[in-house]
Structures are given as C-alpha cells and as structure tokens.
Amino acid sequence: NLFEVWSALKGDVARAVLYMDVRYEGGMHGITNRPEPDLIVVDDPELIQTTPAGVFAPVGYMGLKSVLLQWHAADPPDANEQLRNDVVFSYQGNRNPFIDHPEWAECLYACTCSSPPPAEIFGNGFED
C-alpha cells in the first residue's frame, strides 16, 4: 500500500500531492460542472483506499503526510521544478504554492510558521 520514488524526485512528488490536497476541496468543476473530490493528506494508512477507475469518491485520502513533509524538506524545489511551475502557469494560469513558497508546507501542515504571511502572495496580477 506504499510507494517509494527516487530520492532526487521525492520533494517534487510531495509538493504535487500537497498541491492536490489544497487544490481539490470538493465542489463542482468550474468548466465541466462535474463534481470534484475533496482530496485530503493524512497520516493514517487505514483511511487510504483504492478507488476503481470510473467510480467517483467524494473524499479521497492520500498520504502519508509525515513522509511527504520529510520528502519535501529533504528535496527542496530546484530550477527544473520551478521552470515546470512557470510553464504550467503559462498554460493553465495556476501555480503550485509549495514550489513558490516551500516554507508554507510546514506552516500549513505542521503549524510551524517561521515568518508572518506576505502582504501579497503572487505578483503580476495573478490574484486578480
């Protein structure tokens, strides 16, 4: 029920999963008007279950949170991951905040914020 990835990509995978946790909060997709799941990172492997293809589950548990935070800390965002985030933004208009602000993972998931939140999260009109 567990998986392991290459050490050089552990942080990348962790940030992708953490992004899915904050991005997918349930509700309806803005374009397709189809339901989206509420994806939640947890530390309890008993909650994590496989959902068959084509079956909608309103809540999806994934993790393990403590392992993902370890991977995130051990493998910080590099130039390739930042470039990918920029390219995704140029096409989709969304960014992974854990690549732009790695410190937010510990702040959000471990409640250990090392600095006050910034007055502006993203520049260049992204928040508009």
Predicted region positions:
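Domain-level detector of nuclease and nuclease-like folds
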Residues: 1-117
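Ser/Thr-rich, Pro/Gly/Ala-heavy low-complexity intrinsically disordered linkers and tails
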Residues: 119-128
